[in-house]
């Protein structure tokens, strides 16, 4: 930066120089608005014997003892030129000339190049889009794109620099340049980008600096909704409503209020507001009613507004109202309470006595269920047990009656079960028997339904038994082939059709004749049964 300034200064001096560099004996830099004195370097030892005058760019601008003295330009007794309130027009090549009193010629004693430095002035910065707070601080929304711009006036030239002072940056410089305005931008700005931003302008000739600072904050609302909760207060008669909304900057404003009250009873009068991340309100339970609805609203300065709410509900435990246990066994009864707000405290009682964990009773809480196990049940354990639930709105209980049966009382049940199994087994055996002999049963039923009418039945009997009927049945004529004949038994079976008797006789005779011709068997007539 120093090298650049030196080069600019050198070029500037060249542009304003009217004589060669060898002729200039001194370079003087003055600041606009200040006073400066130019020395006449080679003035005589006896200054009182000479007269002085000063020229600027070849023109006389000041003389000693003028008739109308100038406040802006004046010459001292020793020939020094004093310039008050430097202006840009005062810049140029000044020559100090002297003349002996009574003389007629002027002698140039020294040549001085005066350069006027102005500024920097009018340093201004702009950060947008941003919003001013009452204290002058700017804030932007997290994730937005922010533009930074800085400008100033300076003669002959200037250097501009953007810096930021925050804890997240090791290098404070953000941007540097000689052009005005000097601008840069931050895309998707984050909380780490907040800090104090400074724009510094430095005159390249006088090294004079000027700056302007602006504190910038990055605001963001919590991403989640507020959370509403509750707990018992320090006093037994109080309940504490808790509203929390963490994760934003700056902290939000939280407000508790009653949205919808119960049909009867006084209102909660809960309206309370405070700028905090957690707002706790203590309410006396006497003014709380079933059905009251309360709401917590969180408002953030960025314009984000979110809320949470809940409706107060009295407890309502549920479960089976009847339980049966066998004497000498263990029994577990349970109840469930899920509807209460704030959540109720649930316990087991018997005869208004609180049941706690002992060798006889085992109480287990597996939300939302609360179980009671009675070990080694006896007849004395029979009775009513209460599942008692209570919250700030009130209390309710579920009655569970335990019926205990003794071992003697179960004898009849065991006998009944045995008889039932026996009857079932007999039925299975009878069914299987009937199924396996179904053909015989069906034939017997068929013959029992016939009338006294008769029909002829032809039965074939093995010829090996012919000796038995040899005397009782007339023998048929022998066959020439020498084989045994088949014995034919003809039975008379009742028939309802009397007209078919003659036909049956003819058919029998025909059958006998056919069998006689058959060969190796014989036909024998046997009286019908």
UniProtKB/Swiss-Prot annotation:
InterPro entries (UniProt xref): Cell_adhesion_signaling, Ig-like_dom, Ig-like_dom_sf, Ig-like_fold, Ig_I-set, Ig_sub, Ig_sub2
Chief place where the protein resides: membrane
Extracellular topological domain: 21-411
Residues of the signal peptide: 1-18
Keywords per UniProt: Disulfide bond, Glycoprotein, Immunoglobulin domain, Membrane, Repeat, Signal, Transmembrane, Transmembrane helix
Ig-like C2-type domain ranges (all copies): 19-110, 129-217, 317-403
Gene Ontology CC terms: membrane; neuron projection
Ranges of the Cytoplasmic topological domain: 433-529
Glycosylation sites: 34-35, 46, 135, 147, 159, 211, 269, 280, 284, 330, 357, 376
PANTHER family (alphabetical): NEPHRIN, V-SET AND IMMUNOGLOBULIN DOMAIN-CONTAINING PROTEIN 10
The organism's place on the tree of life at top rank: Eukaryota
Cystine bridges: 40-96, 150-199, 335-387
Classification via Gene3D superfamilies: Immunoglobulins (2.60.40.10)
Membrane topology designation: Single-pass type I membrane protein
Gene field: vsig10
Membrane-spanning segments: 412-432
Subcellular location: Membrane
Name by which UniProt lists this protein: V-set and immunoglobulin domain-containing protein 10
């Amino acid at each position: 930066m120093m090298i650049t300034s030196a080069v600019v200064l050198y070029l500037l001096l060249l542009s304003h120089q009217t004589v060669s560099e060898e002729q200039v004996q001194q370079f003087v830099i003055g600041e606009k608005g200040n006073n400066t004195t130019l020395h006449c370097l080679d003035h005589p030892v006896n200054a009182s014997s000479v007269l002085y005058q000063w020229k600027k760019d070849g023109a006389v601008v000041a003389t000693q003892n003028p008739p109308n003295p100038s406040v802006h330009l004046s010459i001292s007794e020793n020939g020094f030129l004093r310039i008050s309130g430097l202006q840009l027009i005062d810049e140029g090549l000044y020559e100090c000339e002297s003349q002996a009193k009574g003389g007629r010629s002027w002698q140039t004693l020294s040549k001085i190049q005066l350069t006027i430095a102005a500024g920097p002035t009018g340093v201004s910065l702009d950060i947008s889009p941003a919003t001013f707070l009452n204290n002058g601080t700017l804030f932007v929304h997290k994730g937005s794109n922010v533009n930074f711009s800085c400008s100033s006036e300076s003669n002959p030239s200037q250097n501009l620099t953007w810096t930021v002072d925050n804890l997240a940056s090791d290098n404070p410089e953000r941007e540097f340049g000689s052009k005005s305005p000097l601008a840069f931008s931050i895309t998707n700005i984050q909380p780490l980008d907040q800090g104090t931003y400074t724009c510094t302008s430095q005159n390249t000739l006088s090294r004079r600096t000027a700056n302007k600072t602006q504190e910038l904050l990055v605001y963001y609302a919590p991403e989640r909704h507020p959370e509403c909760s509750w707990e018992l207060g320090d006093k037994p008669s109080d309940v504490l409503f808790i509203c929390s909304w963490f994760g934003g900057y700056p902290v939000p404003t939280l407000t508790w209020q009653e949205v919808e009250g119960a049909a009867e009873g006084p209102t909660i009068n809960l309206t309370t507001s405070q700028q905090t991340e957690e707002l706790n309100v203590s309410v006396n339970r006497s003014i709380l009613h079933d059905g009251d609805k309360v709401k917590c609203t969180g408002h953030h300065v960025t314009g984000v507004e979110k809320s949470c709410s809940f409706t107060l509900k009295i407890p309502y435990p549920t479960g089976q109202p009847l339980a049966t246990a066998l004497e000498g066994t263990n029994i577990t009864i349970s109840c469930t309470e899920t509807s209460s707000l704030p959540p109720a405290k649930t316990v087991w009682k018997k005869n208004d006595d609180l049941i706690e964990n002992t060798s006889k009773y085992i109480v287990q809480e597996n939300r939302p269920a609360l179980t009671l196990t009675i070990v080694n049940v006896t007849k004395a354990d029979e009775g009513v047990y209460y599942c008692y639930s209570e919250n700030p709105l009130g209390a309710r209980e579920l009655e569970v009656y335990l019926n205990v049966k003794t071992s003697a009382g179960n004898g009849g049940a065991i006998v009944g079960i045995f008889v039932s199994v026996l009857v079932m087994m007999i039925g299975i055996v009878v069914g299987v028997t009937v199924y396996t002999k179904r053909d015989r049963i069906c034939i017997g039923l068929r013959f029992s339904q016939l009338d006294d009418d008769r029909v002829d039945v032809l039965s074939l009997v093995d010829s090996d038994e012919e000796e038995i009927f040899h005397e009782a049945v007339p023998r048929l004529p022998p066959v020439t082939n020498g084989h045994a004949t088949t014995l034919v038994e003809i039975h008379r079976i009742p028939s309802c059709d009397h007209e078919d008797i003659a036909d049956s006789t003819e058919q029998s005779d025909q059958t006998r004749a056919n069998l006689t011709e058959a060969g190796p068997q014989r036909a024998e007539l046997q009286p019908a049964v």
